[in-house]
């Protein structure tokens, strides 16, 4: 279905070399220290991979999402945190701003990303996870200034990101006009407080709780697509489909990295006088892992190539479900093949198991995404709200 061009193969190989030479040697320490991998940022920036999807007129390469996922997978095989940085410097918040923002907003966002910033998209709230439109964060307009108040939760990059794309209810003249996006350049902004949330995996990129207490944002930092504000929210969320494809690719990369380790180990490890790869039970495990990986990769590639501007919601949801669930299964099976040595910290497998777990949760749970897929198949929006 997909045949990579020579240029794409070269890009893939270049990303693989970068991952092995500049990122893999630091991956374990990044996890143990729970420190942001600035060495990765510098390596990506030097190779012009941060912001590679930006249009050339804004300093990027104008790379397609398809080309971008090729890079993301290679990085994620050795370090999920690095793959996550690659995703969010090319997809999600930056995509929404480049599509719907003013020229000044685009220039600002591009400048920050090209300098090495990983934008933070601020949607989730303590009481508004899957039900994102239930968000309570408010932005009240007073003249040419918006005053933001509320709380965002599980914000990836909180504390290290400069560019924050904050979703909030826009209040004008006392009326709720719908959800809009606001560009906030932080993290040291009056009225903005950030608290890190300790997490199970991908510890090199912080998760955070961000509170806004009458934080002021200039009116020219509001991003709303043309048309009604509610339709504008839907437009902004369309950009999030790309982020889901990126997340699916990180999950795929983690799983592929674990599989590669398991396959090599099975060939070398001997028990009962022969390599364990000769045991049928283990052969079937490897076969199933390979099948899950190839199926997930095809869905990720299809999603990355779908849509005219952003990946389609349907394809992105399918890819994220498939890759997220494959990552959990494949990493656990890879650890099982290694036995006790996989359970130890000398190998990256226990880290991969922890890192993989988030991908059926964040950015849309596997359950809520299945509802979206079903709604598309049935041609209707399947509301999860309790009937009156």
Swiss-Prot record:
According to the record, cofactor stoichiometry and binding are noted as: Binds 1 FAD per subunit.
Q: Does the keyword Hydrolase apply?
A: yes
| Gene Ontology terms, MF aspect | acyl-CoA dehydrogenase activity; flavin adenine dinucleotide binding; hydrolase activity
Give me the reactions it catalyses.
Answer: 3-sulfinopropanoyl-CoA + H2O = propanoyl-CoA + sulfite + H(+)
Gene3D superfamilies, per this entry?
Acyl-CoA dehydrogenase/oxidase, N-terminal domain, Butyryl-CoA Dehydrogenase, subunit A, domain 2, Butyryl-CoA Dehydrogenase, subunit A, domain 3
Keywords in alphabetical order: FAD, Flavoprotein, Hydrolase
Where does the chain bind FAD? 121-124, 130, 153-156, 269, 336, 363-367, 384
- Which cofactors does this gene product need? FAD
Q: Where is this site: Important for activity?
A: 84
Recorded hits in InterPro entries, A to Z, give:
AcdA, Acyl-CoA_Oxase/DH_mid-dom, Acyl-CoA_Oxase/DH_mid-dom_sf, AcylCo_DH-like_C, AcylCo_DH/oxidase_C, AcylCoA_DH/ox_N, AcylCoA_DH/ox_N_sf, AcylCoA_DH/oxidase_NM_dom_sf
Fill in the subunit field for this protein. Answer: Homotrimer or homotetramer.
Name listed for the protein in its UniProt record:
3-sulfinopropanoyl-CoA desulfinase
